[in-house]
UniProtKB/Swiss-Prot annotation:
Residue numbers of N-acetylserine PTMs: 2
Comment field (misc): This is one of two catalases in S.cerevisiae; the other is catalase T, which is the cytoplasmic form. Present with 623 molecules/cell in log phase SD medium.
Compartments where found: Peroxisome matrix
GO molecular function terms listed in the Swiss-Prot or TrEMBL record: catalase activity; heme binding; metal ion binding
Protein's recorded name: Peroxisomal catalase A
Protein source organism: Saccharomyces cerevisiae (strain ATCC 204508 / S288c) (Baker's yeast)
InterPro entries: Catalase (IPR018028), Catalase_AS (IPR024708), Catalase_clade1/3 (IPR024711), Catalase_core (IPR011614), Catalase_haem_BS (IPR002226), Catalase_immune_responsive (IPR010582), Catalase_sf (IPR020835)
């Protein structure tokens, strides 16, 4: 078993020879790796040449399915350190005292791109962190934007498909992209779309961007008191973004620019760090909001729900093997610890299943046995979870395949009092999704964002330009829907987008006429 995640980042598998004698996969020493058995010097090969077959057969199977989405990513190890007491909010052991450190792994990623795509393209960024706590592993599976495109989980596969390739041309498709987003019931995405097409949609590197839970979570203290919580992870390096021209140029010259930047910064001792904050809200406060506390397309006003500092994340160790420690890392919102729970946010509820299930497909049902995913700080014991492909942890030996009453098992009881009525839900089982036509409340925060961009030189202009350049690739009918949607934010913005799109179209016509 690997010692990954302990005092030193090591890959030290027991089946790897320390004397570095080269063998085939069964441990048989190889005299010469590049010879093949054949009849004479120029005759056909022999099927009995197992070393050749062993090598080729493994080569055919060495790739695993890529993530869908978040395929292109980078990662590093580090630690989380508590700087402020929040035990009145959360009873998790990782927050138990100031100065306490917890080992962690963070993976950054783009969302829509393939594994080999550029990491400077316009796209949200994933910001996932696995904490190896003494109460089990905890995954914060976040993004670099505080909101998202949808609030109905059933739309997630459809939305992700629009961010990928046309099934006929295998090309990115502006019609698909904007057709989905401008459908009336999907225009709740407007806030996220504006963040995406501002310069914040092209971060300069992974070190210089924030992370957000987006979702509302439910945290409890050891007295049983609970709050709704959102988490903000603020970069200590300062926000740095690229313009569309800079991002496009870098994508063409170095598609792994952000990955290289992260690796080299850590390698050179320039360890990136982020300060972790939380926003908290009582159930009573939630009922007073003009929107649902479970609406993933909305932010909580910081004037009303101020940020409260918690601690710091520092990344100071590069992976020793990318495949073993980053590609095989499995993050899921369902991976949680005592006192940190999911809320009734419907998209979060759906992610509780879908993320872990994606890892079962991508890595196999025993993905938790892969060293990078092992809860090494708390260990694992449940003899009913056993067998299956690639079970390599001893399979609990002679333990019964069920939890037997006559065995001396230990069950840990949480310290907090059991509250029977923390949340009360009462109603019929119904088919439901949010309002089919977004109301004015769904555009308020987008308008506020546009005003904020107006205080930053050139940012409103860049937003209009970035949208106009992209929407020009869509058909005229969809273009008009885009203009109409942004007119609900600001008529001047809508007109500026249209002007950019028309200018780009005219320029392309002029260029084509020269040939």
């Amino acid at each position: 078993m690997s010692k990954l995640g302990q005092e030193k980042n090591e890959v030290n598998y027991s089946d790897v020879r320390e004397d570095r004698v080269v063998t085939n996969s069964t441990g048989n020493p190889i005299n010469e790796p590049f010879v093949t058995q054949r009849i004479g010097e120029h005759g056909p090969l022999l099927l009995q040449d197992y070393n050749l077959i062993d090598s080729l057969a493994h080569f055919n199977r060495e790739n695993i399915p890529q993530r869908n989405p978040h395929a292109h990513g980078s990662g590093a190890f580090g630690y989380f350190e508590v700087t402020d007491d929040i035990t009145d909010i959360c009873g998790s052991a990782m927050f138990s005292k100031i100065g306490k450190r917890t080992k962690c792994l963070t993976r950054f990623s783009t969302v829509g791109g393939d594994k080999g795509s550029a990491d400077t393209v316009r796209d949200p960024r994933g910001f996932a962190t696995k904490f190896y706590t003494e109460e089990g592993n905890l995954d914060w599976v976040y993004n670099n934007t505080p909101v998202f495109f949808i609030r109905d989980p059933s739309k997630f596969p459809h939305f992700i498909h629009t961010q990928k390739r046309n099934p006929q041309t295998n090309l990115r498709d502006a019609d698909m992209f904007w057709d989905f987003l401008t459908t009336p019931e999907n225009q709740v995405a407007i806030h996220q779309v504006m963040i995406l097409f501002s310069d914040r949609g092209t971060p300069a590197n992974y070190r210089s961007m924030h992370g957000y839970s987006g979702h509302t979570y439910k945290w409890s203290n050891k007295n049983g008191d609970w709050h709704y919580v959102q988490v903000h992870i603020k970069t200590d390096q300062g926000i740095k973004n690229l313009t569309i021209e800079e991002a496009t140029k870098i994508a063409g010259s170095n598609p792994d620019y952000c990955q290289q930047d992260l690796f080299e910064a850590i390698q050179n001792g320039n360890y990136p760090s982020w300060t972790v904050y939380i926003q908290t809200m009582t159930e009573r406060d939630a009922k007073k909001l003009p929107f649902s506390v479970f609406d993933l397309t909305k932010v909580w006003p910081q004037g009303q729900f101020p940020l409260r500092r918690v601690g710091k994340i520092v990344l100071n160790e590069n992976p020793l093997n990318f495949f073993a420690q980053v590609e095989q890392a499995a993050f899921a919102p369902s991976t949680t610890v005592p006192y940190q729970e999911a809320s009734a946010d419907p998209v979060l509820q759906a992610r509780l299943f879908s993320y872990a299930d994606a890892h079962r497909y991508r890595l196999g049902p025993n993905f938790h046995q892969i060293p990078v995913n092992c809860p090494y700080a708390s260990k694992f014991f449940n003899p009913a979870i056993r067998d299956g492909p690639m079970n390599v942890n001893g399979n609990f030996g002679s333990e019964p395949t069920y939890l037997a009453n006559d065995k001396s098992y230990t069950y840990i009881q949480q310290d907090r009092p059991i509250q029977q009525h923390q949340e009360v839900w009462n109603g019929p089982a119904i088919p439901y999704h949010w309002a089919t036509s977004p109301g004015d409340v769904d555009f308020v925060q987008a308008r506020n964002l546009y005003r904020v961009l107006g205080k930053q030189p050139g940012q409103q202009k860049n937003l209009a330009y970035n949208i106009g350049i992209h929407v020009e690739g869509a058909c005229p009918q969809i273009q008009q829907r885009v203009y109409d949607m942004f007119a609900r934010v600001d008529k001047g913005l809508s007109e500026a987008i249209k002007k950019v799109a028309e200018a780009k179209h005219a320029s392309e016509l002029s260029s084509n006429s020269k040939f």
